[in-house]
Regions:
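N-terminal Sec signal peptide cleavage junction
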Residues: 1-12
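Beta-rich carbohydrate-recognition and catalytic domains
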Residues: 11-46, 50-103, 113-178, 189-244, ...
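Conserved beta-strand position repeated once per blade in WD40 beta-propeller domains
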Residues: 46-48, 107-109, 184-186, 249-251, ...
Length: 370
């Protein structure tokens, strides 16, 4: 059974703050299955969802093309307004051996704009995480297309965000551990062209966090990314709803007219049983966009998605349903896509029993009522 948040009345402070209804009940619609490689030893997770004016949704996600082999590709399906889907196809793969991205290619975030490279102007950019064989850390790349239905995307050859340390190879963090690097990008258009709000996860000797930067990819010969800043984390609560939480692996979307930014994030810590690398719950939070970019203010929860809502013990790697520019149609009642997984004793880390083979994509929507 879904749990609810009760939001009390708050006074209007400025035109960007909509007055909340007294004792508004917030819940979510019954989650619906969207996609999974069912009956196969394959996973589908980390979605990026773009809603078109006619109701069509372009869904990009991470998957493995071969049974039992955990090598990430980025796949695409188109979900028609009547609910029918196109066949899943791999549209971005690891690079050639020896390249910076020759191992995994995952975590897509797709945006519309105007991006010029080698005298060609592209309409869409796909930001992604990748890494190479022989190292543990991740970095961020970008690829381009003029068609959301494209069978393949044109990769920019180098990383656009590199690891945070200058030395070659992995960064040791003690206890035999290694730094995760940078990845899990989320991009929002600021001008409908090449200027973007870029957020991504950092995992290094300084800890785990999400940072944001303003980027300009209008011309890839002279692209720029500002010095990243750690996002505001005030107001975020851990699984106990009391302890302060930290952020990683989150998706963002904005409503510029309302001056709001919305985030869907994992709630820490992760459970201790297998798979102990996936979160059980997700949360949707919001704050003023102007506060976010000025490093002030605090997050307010909209809804926390738990196993009671979904029927699955793990709920992770989520996205908000956005338009092509990363904007929300209704920031107060967003639709979202998320990944589920089974847990022990239903799965175990071996062969065809891995938890990964139960990664499927579902969707739901926040609903408010008086």
């Amino acid at each position: 059974m879904a749990h609810v948040f009760l939001l009390g009345h708050r006074p209007r402070r400025n035109p960007s703050d909509r007055p909340a209804n007294t004792y508004t009940t917030v819940t979510i619609t019954k989650p619906e299955f969207v996609f999974g490689f069912q009956g196969q030893s394959k996973y589908s997770y980390c979605p990026s969802a773009l809603k078109q004016a006619d109701g069509t949704v372009h869904l990009y996600f991470c998957g493995n093309p071969e049974n039992l082999i955990m090598v990430d590709n980025i796949f695409h399906i188109k979900i028609n307004p009547d609910g029918t889907q196109t066949a899943a196809k791999s549209v971005l793969q690891p690079g050639v051996s020896g390249s910076w991205d020759d191992h995994h290619t995952c975590d897509p975030s797709v945006i519309e704009g105007s991006f010029t490279w080698k005298n060609t102007t592209y309409k869409y950019a796909m930001f992604f995480l990748s890494n190479m064989y022989g190292v543990y850390y991740n970095e961020i790349g970008v690829a381009f297309s003029n068609d959301l239905d494209a069978d393949s995307w044109v990769k920019y050859p180098q990383q656009i965000v590199k690891k945070t340390w200058s030395s070659e190879g992995d960064q040791e963090i003690g206890g035999g551990g290694k730094s995760w690097g940078v990845g899990q990008p989320s991009v929002v258009s600021l001008d409908g062209k090449g200027k973007l709000l870029l957020t991504y996860t950092v995992g290094d000797i300084g800890g785990t966090r999400i940072v944001w930067a303003e980027a300009d990819f209008s011309n890839m010969d002279t692209y720029s990314v500002s010095t990243p800043q750690t996002i505001v984390q005030t107001g975020l609560k851990a699984i106990d709803n009391q302890s302060r939480d930290y952020t990683c692996n989150s998706e963002f979307a904005i409503d510029k007219d309302a001056d709001k930014i919305v985030m869907i994030r994992p709630v820490q810590p992760m459970p201790s049983d297998y798979p102990n690398y996936l979160n059980s719950s997700l949360e949707i939070d919001y704050m003023n966009l102007s506060d976010f970019t000025n490093q002030r203010g605090n997050w307010t929860p909209i809804y926390r998605i738990t196993p009671d809502d979904t029927g699955y013990p793990r709920n992770h790697n989520a996205t908000l349903l956005r338009d092509n520019f990363g904007h929300l149609q209704d920031w107060e009642e967003p639709e979202f896509y998320f990944t589920v997984s089974k847990a022990t004793p239903d799965v175990q880390p071996s062969g065809s029993s891995h938890a990964e083979w139960t990664y499927h994509i579902w969707k739901s929507k926040v609903v408010k009522s008086k």
